[in-house]
């Protein structure tokens, strides 16, 4: 593959800049998230919006608490989780042509939304906050109070370059709480995050592949192990996975397929059938409902980035770059002023835990690593 092949999916007028960006990546030491990407590869969406992907199948989220026993509930948790992956990792290729670099949220940036009650499923609400800027960390809280299902977590990324691929280690976890109908009991599920590979850089058409393993561990001692593989040079299908639900080292159910396509039970299913459909990723996703920008607070994401996002969408990259620089310079000055006054930034919607005990207890059940991790919990709010 020669130099002439670099960025063949990139507009001709942008190819020189793309080639320079690739060289910058290859020689950069440290976390790539701090690099400034060429304008045409920027997304008009802030990273603080990404937790919304967890909620884009609100029916599946609400159904989790309807399982008749812990085994059925774990199957429902896995189904909801697999259902979130297409939105999280491939849907932007359809909507924007290829994976784009999201806007790096400012400290304290908020994203608030909801999925309305339909068919008596209950309303699902979302609160996300950028709780750290160096390194960038987003905390989120998703809740369907009627269904008794709540998800809380945080996510950060550590990125590096290898060959022609960006490797992304997702840092963080989520805790899913399920209140059991007719009792005061609740089940917890620790959800760890898969690592990512961003491929297709050479051609200027990046896409995401999942790699390695992730886990879902419940307080009922059930463990789901997910293994991800992608398309190799000679074999394999893109976006493939295998999930095994087990207890005490014994496999109970196995699901295989493509997380961006169709997956099926391998052998028996939870309903007693054989090789049944598990999930079809063409199932319609529901976008989160958000207040109009004019009604949003000054720290809400789409208000913060309104001019930048409009510039990116309209191809006016000069305006987008200028306003992005204005925002970032104002943030740097704000941090300096806070340091000088001895008044550090305070989280608005979340509390930071130096050691998330629920994570530690659940991770110990499957010898998960790291053994300890910090966490975030939503502050109680007065309505």
Swiss-Prot record:
Q: Where is this region: Disordered?
A: 317-346
Alphabetic keyword roster: Lipid transport, Lipid-binding, Transport
Q: Name one Pfam family in it.
A: Oxysterol_BP
Q: Where is the composition biased (Basic and acidic residues)?
A: 317-339
Q: Which InterPro entries does this one have? A: OSBP_sf (IPR037239), Oxysterol-bd (IPR000648), Oxysterol-bd_CS (IPR018494)
Its GO CC terms?
A: cytosol; membrane
The UniProt entry's GO biological process terms, in alphabetical order, are: lipid transport
Q: Which GO terms describe its molecular function?
A: oxysterol binding
What this chain does, per the entry, is described as:
Lipid transporter involved in lipid countertransport between the Golgi complex and membranes of the endoplasmic reticulum: specifically exchanges sterol with phosphatidylinositol 4-phosphate (PI4P), delivering sterol to the Golgi in exchange for PI4P, which is degraded by the SAC1 phosphatase in the endoplasmic reticulum.
Family the UniProt entry places it in: Belongs to the OSBP family.
PANTHER family for this protein: OXYSTEROL-BINDING PROTEIN HOMOLOG 4-RELATED, OXYSTEROL-BINDING PROTEIN-RELATED
The protein, known as = Protein KES1
> Species name for this entry?
Mycosarcoma maydis (Corn smut fungus)
Top-level taxonomy: Eukaryota, Fungi, Dikarya, Basidiomycota, Ustilaginomycotina
Tell me the gene name: KES1
